C-alpha cells in the first residue's frame, strides 16, 4: 500500500454529469463506463460504490487516435464518475464554499439546444464554482450524419459531408450564443487556445461513442493541468461527503460516501451529520462491489476492504447510522480534540442550511438530505418565494402548525413542500394546507411557483369580482327602450368597464341608480368594455328625460376603498382608457370629498 501511495502524487478528479431531462446524461455515462470495461485489462478497474472509476490506461487507449492533437502525459490515476446524473445527487456533493466535484459535463442535445434544466444546471454549477465542459450530444441525429466506427469526433467529422459539417457548426454556434448570453465564452474544443478563459464544447454521440475520446482526454487534461493543487494527494485522515443513506437487508443502515481527501481505514472514528446533530461512530466495514467483468452486471455483491484512499466511492457500515444525513460532511478524527472540532464544523454546516423565522409568512420546506434542502432553498430564493421553515426529515405536527400560521397571513404561502419525505406515521396534513411532493428538485420548485400563481390569480379574481371598477358610458340618443322602473337604454362604453350591480353617478357626482343587467345582441353578458355598444337596465328612482337624458355621459360610482385596492394591488389590469376614467372620477368625487384617492398614484 505504501508503495502505491508513494506513486500517487495526484488523486483522480471527481466528475459529475448534469443537463436537461432526455438529453442523454445516463446514456453518456453508460457509454463511458461500457467503453472503459471493453478497453480495460483484467484487474485494472477498481470497483466503487455510487461512482465509476476509469483508469488512465483506459483513457489513453480510447484516446489513442488523438496522440498528436493532445500530446499530454497523464499523471492522474484516472477519472471518477459519479454514477447518478442530475441535480438531486449532485446537490449532496456539497462542501463548504463549493462542491466535492472537480469538474462537470453539461450534457446538451445539440439539435434542441439549451432547455429549462440546462439553465438550472448552469446556475448550480456557477453557484458551487464547479468548472464544466459541454457535451453537445446526439450528433447522430443531425440529418445526413454517417456514424463511423471510432471514439474520436475529429476522425468522424472528416468523413461527414460538407453540408452536415455546416449544420453541426450552426448547432454549435447556437450553443456558443446561449452560453454567451449567460456570460460564458465558449467554442468547439478544437478551436480553443486558452482553456482557462473558454468553455469547451465537445460534439459527441452517446449512442455511437463518437466524441468519447475527446471528452475523456479533455476531462483528464484540463483537470491535471489546471487543478494540480486541488488534486494533490494527502496521506492523512479521510474527508468525504455522504451521497446516500441506505438500509441493507441483514446488515442495517449504511452510508454511501465519496472520499475526496486522505485515507479511510477500518475502525476509524468518523464524525457525520445526523438528523438530531453530529454523530460520532466507528467504521465497522468498508464495502465495495466485487470485481466485474461486464458493466451490465448489477453492483450488488459487496466485499470488505481494510482501507481506501481518495478519490473513491465506498459503502460504510457503522453503528448509529439510521439518522445519518445525506449531503453531510464525513471526517475521520484521530483524537478527542479533533472530534470536538469536527462536531462543531458539522453543527455549523447543518445550521447554515436549516432555517426558521416565525416573523415571515412563507412556505415550509422539508427534504431528505442536507444537499437537496440547500438546493431547494437556493432555488426558492432566486424565485423570491419566502420561506418560514426549512428542515430535514419527515413532516411533523410543528410543520403543519407553522404552515397554518402562514395561511392566516398569506393564503398563497400555506404550503408544505416535501422533497422525498412523507408525514410521520399518524400525522395527516389538513386539506387547507397545500402539500406539494416531488422527487425532482426543479419539479418541486415549478409546482410551488405554479400553485402560488394559481392562488394569487384566484384571489385576484375574487377580489376584482367584489370591487366596483371605474367605467364611463354614454346614453345613445334614439335608443331608449324603457324610460323608467327600470330604465332600459342603449349605451356606448367610452372607457373602463361596466358590470351588473355597479352603482352609477352623473358628472356632478349624484348617484342615479345601479346597473341591473347588460345585454349584447340580446344575450346577457357580465361586463362591457371600451368600444362596446350594449343595452343596459338601470334600477333607481329615475326617468329618462328628467333625472337623466339621451346623450348624457354617466360614470360608475367607485367607493374610495375599492379604488385604493385597485391602485395598490391590481395596477396591472388598469388599461390606458381606464386610467383616464379614474382621473375623471377622482375630479368628480373630490368636489364633495377632498380626501378621495388622496396619496394614491394613478
Swiss-Prot record:
GO terms for cellular component: cytoplasm. Residues 205-207 are annotated as: G5. CDD domains: aeIF5B_II (cd03703), IF2_aeIF5B_IV (cd16266), IF2_eIF5B (cd01887). Keywords: GTP-binding, Initiation factor, Nucleotide-binding, Protein biosynthesis. The keyword Protease does not apply. SUPFAM superfamilies: Initiation factor IF2/eIF5b, domain 3, P-loop containing nucleoside triphosphate hydrolases, Translation proteins. Residues 10-227 form the tr-type G domain. Residues 83-86 are annotated as: G3. Residues 137-140 are annotated as: G4. GTP binds at residues 19-26, 83-87, 137-140. Residues 19-26 are annotated as: G1. The keyword GTP-binding applies. Residues 44-48 are annotated as: G2. One of its GO terms (molecular function) is translation initiation factor activity. NCBIfam families: aIF-2, PRK04004.1, small_GTP. Function in general translation initiation by promoting the binding of the formylmethionine-tRNA to ribosomes. Seems to function along with eIF-2. Belongs to the TRAFAC class translation factor GTPase superfamily. Classic translation factor GTPase family. IF-2 subfamily. This is Probable translation initiation factor IF-2. It comes from Sulfurisphaera tokodaii (strain DSM 16993 / JCM 10545 / NBRC 100140 / 7). The gene is infB.
